[in-house]
Amino acid sequence: AELYQRAVAQAAFSPVMQVHSETSGDPNPSQARTPWNMAERKGDSACLDTYRFFANVRMNLLPYLYTEARHSSRTGEPLMRSMAYAFPGDETAAEYEFQYMFGGSLLVAPAVEMGEETLDVYFPEGTWYGLFDGKAYTAGIHTVDCPLGTLPVFVKSGSILPLNLGESGKLGGSVGNATDSYQNLTFWAYPGGGEYSWYDYVNGKEETVKVLADGKMQRANGTESADIVLQGNGWRNSGQAG
């Protein structure tokens, strides 16, 4: 149950989120790694709960994922980037072989040892923010919590994340499986001001979004109405942008 939950959490932040299985020749018990089957086999409903949450997160991230995957297909730059690749001038970063960048904005630090509840994470130069809790981290090594059912993911300062969120406006909320519309297109912006060109896959066009240091958003070539939410360091005002 622990390995399954760790695997599906990390898979949400990889190019392909998919579970595989093989048969033993005996259909009872089934070897299928569907979350409902795993929950039944292991007698642990958390398998289903963890999968549901991270499957929803995956769909929430789709505007960001599509944009970053499109960048990879056009440039050859990998979607998952080792710390050594992403930060070539940082010798310490290269020592953290299990951490990686997922696209240009997200740092992922999966737990890889059985029973881990905390994890030492190395943050390169700058300020980083917890994707799920907004906590700020300065450069260096920090010990972070990683209980089962969670995954440490951090956002680089100055980033802008295009997201498709559900009614709650939070990561992990269901938006279904449709890719022909957005339920709530939302840009999460992080302190430092930045610019991000994202691909609007619903309307088939690229748009540049800029967030100034004061939190004001400027959009060029935008079709869909969207919310902006300013994240990090208590910077949580929100407003509408069209």
Where in the sequence are the language-model features?
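Accessory, solvent-exposed terminal regions and/or long lumenal/extracellular loops of proteins
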Residues: T150-G242
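Catalytic-domain carbohydrate-binding cleft regions of carbohydrate-active enzymes
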Residues: A1-T150, V155-K156, G193-S197, Y201-E206
